[in-house]
């Protein structure tokens, strides 16, 4: 059975969260997958954006809730 081609369009790059040793970036972008609605997307991307790792896509409503939940969160308070 042939692999289904996944289409994507990076509509806007918001920023890079981290870069790993192999040069892949964990990025926040606005991405349209398979001609669907553009969503905020957090995932790892190869240096040329040809290869893509697993990630998470969020609707506008989910992003609004996430912002609210993180508003008072201090990542430096968490014990490691």
Where are these regions (language model features)?
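Positively charged, low-complexity terminal tracts
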Residues: 1-80
């Amino acid at each position: 059975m042939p692999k289904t081609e996944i289409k994507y369009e990076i509509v806007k790059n918001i920023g890079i969260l981290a870069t790993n040793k192999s040069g892949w970036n964990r990025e926040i972008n606005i991405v349209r997958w398979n001609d669907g609605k553009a969503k905020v997307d957090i995932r790892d991307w190869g240096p040329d954006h040809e290869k893509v790792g697993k990630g998470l896509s969020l609707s506008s409503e989910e992003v609004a809730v996430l912002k609210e939940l993180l508003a008072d969160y201090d990542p430096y308070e968490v014990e490691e």
